[in-house]
C-alpha cells in the first residue's frame, strides 16, 4: 500500500502486516533537492510503476505561512521505479487530485487554488509532461477515472462531477455533503466516496481503470 502522508510529509509504503498493532512505514521519498515536501496529498501510479504525486500545503498547520515550510513551489513530482525524482509541474497554486487516463497517455490534475480548474497533460514516453491545457473549469479534490475515460471529480457542490473524456459534464452524484475523494473498488463497478464524516459507495454500470 502506498501512502501520501500529510503529517510526515512523505510518500511511504506500508511495511507491516494489516493486523500489526502498530503500523510501520518505509519512506520512498521525503523531499526534493534537499528540502522537505510540503504535505504530499495524492498519488497516481503509471503502469510502468512510476509514481506521480501532488504536494500542496494543506497538511501544514499554518499553510503557506507555516515556518516549517521549505519548498516555495507546490509541485507535482514523478518518482521512477529506479528511485529518480523529478518535478514535472511547478506552476499550479494548489495541485490536489491526480489520475491517469485509461491509456496512460494523459494525466489529470485538479487545482484547488485560483483559478479552480482540472488540468490535463500529455504523458510523453520519457515520463515528462507536455501540452498543458484546461480540461474542465471547476474546483476539485480527488479524481478517479473509469474505463471509458470519464473523469470523476470529488469536491464541488456537495457531490462528485462526472466529466466525459471530451471535457463535457455528464452528471453529478449528489451526496448532499462536501466530498474529498473517490476511488473504484470491489469488482470495479463500485465507486467509493469520502464525504465529511461518511464513507459512501454507489454501483455504476462502468468499471474503473485497473479492473
Q: What residue ranges belong to the model's regions?
A:
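Short loop/turn segments immediately following the C-termini of beta-strands
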Residues: 6, 56-58, 112-113, 156, ...
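Short loop/turn segments immediately following beta-strands, especially the blade-tip
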Residues: 14-20, 120-128, 203-211
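A short loop-to-beta-strand structural motif that recurs across blades of beta-propeller domains
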Residues: 10-12, 74-77, 117-119, 159-161, ...
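Asp-box/WD-like beta-propeller blade repeats and closely related beta-sheet repeat scaffolds
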Residues: 8-67, 73
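Beta-propeller fold detector
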Residues: 23-30, 86-90, 129-137, 171-175, ...
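Short, structured patches in soluble enzyme cores that scaffold and shape functional sites
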Residues: 55, 80, 89-92, 102, ...
